[in-house]
Amino acid sequence: MCKLTKTEIERRIKIDFPNDYDCTLLNIRDIMPDVSEKQVKLWEKSKALEYVVIDGRKMYFRRAVRNLFRTDSRARSYYIGKYGDDRAARAEFLAKYLPEIIGKTDQKVFDFRFTLSVKPDVVPEGETIRCWLPSPAEYRYQTLISSHKNVKKSVHSTVYYEQTAQRGKPTVFSTRFRFRSRSFFYKTDDRSQYDNADSKYIIEQPPHIVFTEPIRRLSEEIVGNEKDKHTIAKRIFTWISDNIPWAAAREYSTIDNIPEYVLHNRHGDCGQVTLLFMTLCRYNGIPARWVSGFMLHTAYENLHDWCEIYLDSTGWVPVDVSFGIQRYSEDEDIRYFYFMGIDAYRLVVNRGISGELSPPKTFERSECVDFQRGEVEWRGGNIYFDSFDYNFTVTEVSDCMQPFDSATYGE
């Protein structure tokens, strides 16, 4: 876990909230021309339009306008009617894919390249830049086939590099690897209780997995007097899927308690709703642990977070609460595939939150919870996200293809 100064947190918030009211209203009217200022105030009140007050002025999240048209039901309907549903293609793909993999294991082999570029002159010429990039974790549904650099195994799976900064030039770090990913779906009618073998995954893990009063109240509402662990976990999964729409997230490092933030704002990205799910599960005595990395579905490749829960007679099973209920299907196994199931379009990098990198960073991290975008620093301090760019490419390859030759790719 990284401890940031108040000044650093405020600096990061200013980066995330750059737009004033006039700019935000203009951006909303680009999509919905006739919207009134009264309606904007109602969206602010409902938390659909996210802002903070900085130096006495309302400043809006850099992705607040797009999030508005995701989280407010009427605004979302308007957006879909005008532009179409940007998630329809993924739903169509899953509607065909998921029935094909239930009852068997699907395997995919991917070639993955990740590049991080520190902007020119962020670091003085001649200084050493230290860099950590993501790599495949040891995970039972994932096998590393080839990598051109040794992988450091910890909570966060990394490869480490150093380079010397040059004046006027970006400092570029790259890694490449090939891995196999497998799908999993556990279908069971067993409702027996688990044994309490994994107690470290039931306890609080501050600052985000904490059994606060809002968590206790919500648990009462969702769980009631239910004692069966499988049923409790499924009820939590269903409640989040029904009540918390996906929205792009502000930086986790600027949020005191992520599950409470989700409940207050009534939206969250994949990691935020996963932390809420994990906290509610742990509060109810269900072991839960973090898993994250990337989702690799064609045209939807992105960073992604999910988790695992432990139930007796099943052991650890994956849960992707962000993918949630598949509402296009009437088949219960399809609808709840991502409760105790995962597809093969995944890259796992992290097996927990807020771990230490290998070798350890000297300064605070840019991302204090997760690790996907890479981390960089020099002897003068951390290099934050606004000072570097990253990108990745992924290619599905034939299982029979030979591993790539690391000598032809280089470090």
Question: Which role fits each region the language model picked out?
Answer:
Residues 2-185:
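Intrinsically disordered, low-complexity N-terminal segments that are enriched in acidic
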Residues 112, 129, 173, 261, ...:
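A broad, low-specificity signal marking well-ordered, structured residues that form hydrophobic/aromatic
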Residues 141-144, 265, 316-320:
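Short, well-ordered strand-loop elements centered on a beta-strand within folded domains, enriched
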Residues 154-160, 165-264:
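Acidic low-complexity segments
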Residues 228, 262, 266-269, 295, ...:
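Alpha-helix N-cap/loop-to-helix boundary motif
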Residues 229-236, 265-281:
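Active-site nucleophilic cysteine motif
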Residues 272-361:
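Hydrophobic/aromatic-rich core segments of domains that either
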Residues 341-411:
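Low-complexity, Gly/Ser/Thr/Pro-rich intrinsically disordered linker/tail segments
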